[in-house]
């Protein structure tokens, strides 16, 4: 199994506009639907396989997700979450249009293994000389990284990613980092069935990172 930080680090080796380039290049309507969802919310591939509900309410685009990695006995994960996204992004515009075509509601599904395979193939096609390939999890790590670099509250990040605890987000990017992806996540609001548990470990980690950033800037 890959180290949890490996995908985060690999984002730095992808083309700066990799999300836009991949999305533009896809001709298959079914795959384009799936990649639009990944670009918009960074859901897990297993959640995409279950089906993502796309709806328009009061002219706002909402994606409903049934969570993966959920265990009611241990309190792990969020069973369901709703995410309001920026519909001015290329994938936001696309999903808004698709939902309107389907009388304001539709469900998008794609096989978890299949979508990553298609993305790796597309990555090789677009960037044959790059060793780092785009996968479904690249989108999830991008959303987490961008939200952190944008200074979004830990609770909002946890809700977006489907975490029960705000400490789980520590493998996605770093607050106060390079800021290269600041403002690019497109998440307006996230709502979950269960409240997010706050971890004191996150406070300690954020304090440590703040000191490190300050020291490195001296």
Which residues does each predicted region cover?
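DNA breakage-rejoining catalytic core of tyrosine-based enzymes
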Residues: 1-17, 72-87
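Basic, Lys/Arg- and aromatic-enriched nucleic-acid-binding interface segment
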Residues: 12-45
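Short, amphipathic alpha-helical "recognition" segments used to contact nucleic acids or chromatin
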Residues: 35, 141-149
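Active-site-proximal segment of tyrosine recombinases
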Residues: 48, 134, 144, 151-163
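Conserved tyrosine-mediated DNA breakage-rejoining catalytic core shared by Y-recombinases
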Residues: 50-93
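Active-site/catalytic core of tyrosine-dependent DNA strand-transfer enzymes
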Residues: 86-132, 137-138
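Catalytic-site neighborhood detector that most strongly recognizes the C-terminal catalytic loop/helix
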Residues: 161-189
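C-terminal secondary-structure termini that scaffold catalytic or DNA-interacting sites
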Residues: 186-218
